């Protein structure tokens, strides 16, 4: 739906482009990359060190998607060796606040969620 030169989506409608955006920003690697870039411009290798457990392939794919969606800027400098840096765009910076809230929620509720998972697993375990 277009109103006043602005596109307004409805993520509850099948085929709405907002679903793709939600898929991107709801991804765990996106949350961690945006958090890592919150205050810094970082090189690929620095991001990889900061985000433990992310593979080179996944970091590359996620950064490309974030760049495609206008959330991250990739800058290549003409140095030897070539220097490639990533930083959040204004849109990426505006995403940091809601993603930080999700990060904080996951930390604050970790014990409760782990307890619920353990209870669920023990309920589903076969009795001896």
Features from the language model and the residues they span:
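Basic amphipathic alpha-helical segments that dock to polyanions
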Residues: 59, 63-66
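N-terminal helix-turn-helix DNA-binding core of bacterial DNA-binding proteins
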Residues: 12-58, 78-79, 85-87, 93
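Conserved beta-strand edge residues that scaffold enzyme active sites
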Residues: 79-80, 116
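Amphipathic alpha-helical dimerization/coiled-coil segments
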Residues: 1-5, 13, 93-128
């Amino acid at each position: 739906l277009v109103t006043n030169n602005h596109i307004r989506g409805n993520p509850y409608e099948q085929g709405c482009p907002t679903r793709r955006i939600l898929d991107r920003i709801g991804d765990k690697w996106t949350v961690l990359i945006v958090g890592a870039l919150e205050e810094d411009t970082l090189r690929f290798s620095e991001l990889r060190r900061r985000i433990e457990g992310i593979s080179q392939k996944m970091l590359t794919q996620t950064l490309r998607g974030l760049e495609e969606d206008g959330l991250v800027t990739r800058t290549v400098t003409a140095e030897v060796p070539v220097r490639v840096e990533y930083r959040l765009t204004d849109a990426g910076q505006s995403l940091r606040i809601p993603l930080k809230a999700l990060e904080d929620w996951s930390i604050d509720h970790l014990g409760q969620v782990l307890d619920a998972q353990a209870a669920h697993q023990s309920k589903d375990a076969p009795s001896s």
